[in-house]
């Protein structure tokens, strides 16, 4: 294997794209490597490409120790686990997969919407427990309800398109879009202030990157502005929602329920403040985990890692790195 450029994969990233890389490069894969920082540092010493998902914390310290590193490939959308500034200063390209799992996430959102609106998980548990409580599980239709999309990017846009098929009214808040933006005009969304979005939404779907502005955005004050009949769904980043504030809002009946694919801490452990609520549905960060989506995600990141190692520009990149000397 000597003489080949080395690629390290520190999490469970598999697929035809990785198999193609293995034919060209020295690919070292350990799905648990992210758990041991010392072993990870050692593995990156002579590595030119590094592929991760969302568990590996690619810190400035880790980057500083990887002198040969040229590209970090994030198999997925969010890259808040990567110190992009440090990578840029070190001349390292950060590539990602910005829309390859968008359909899967949008479909998961509607799975949560329908499960909440029709109380499907509770009804299922009741019947399996010997019950037949039809009155308890009266639901509500999506037709004619108002969907609020917080972040009308590649995923939020696809959620809005599906909402049209359900006959929903669509509101959106996105600081980067105007009323003439393609995502707005094609989805039929009306851009509104965040306060209007919170106040008028029957279903609120969150699609925000994690940064200092969005961290904790959905807190006690935000929940106080929502309808008591409204449902919250978050498939973006757990830290956008303040979990204890959400629990209090649910306890006080300020909102009707929540579907969360992401939490502030993942995995959350055996005890969590939201476990006791029947009107909360939790999934283990699986919104983008379909066979179809993951094949596309891995194919995209593998393509860009290969391009950078071949001296070509990445097609899907986060940063503009300072050229290495």
Regions found by a protein language model. Name each.
Residues 1-95, 199, 219:
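An N-terminal-biased, well-structured beta-alpha scaffold segment characteristic
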Residues 11, 174-176, 236:
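N-terminal Rossmann-fold cofactor-binding loop
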Residues 48-49, 71, 203, 231, ...:
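Short, Asp-centered acidic motifs that coordinate Mg2+ and/or phosphate
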Residues 55, 77, 202, 208-210, ...:
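Short glycine-/small-residue-rich Rossmann-like dinucleotide-binding loops
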Residues 57, 78-81, 96, 100, ...:
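Residue-level detector of alpha-helix initiation sites
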Residues 90, 98-146, 158-161, 165, ...:
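Phosphate-binding beta-alpha-beta segment of Rossmann-like dinucleotide-binding domains, i.e.
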Residues 94-95, 220, 229-325:
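Rossmann-like dinucleotide-binding domain for NAD(H)/NADP(H)
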Residues 135-228:
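Rossmann-like dinucleotide/phosphate-binding beta-alpha-beta segment
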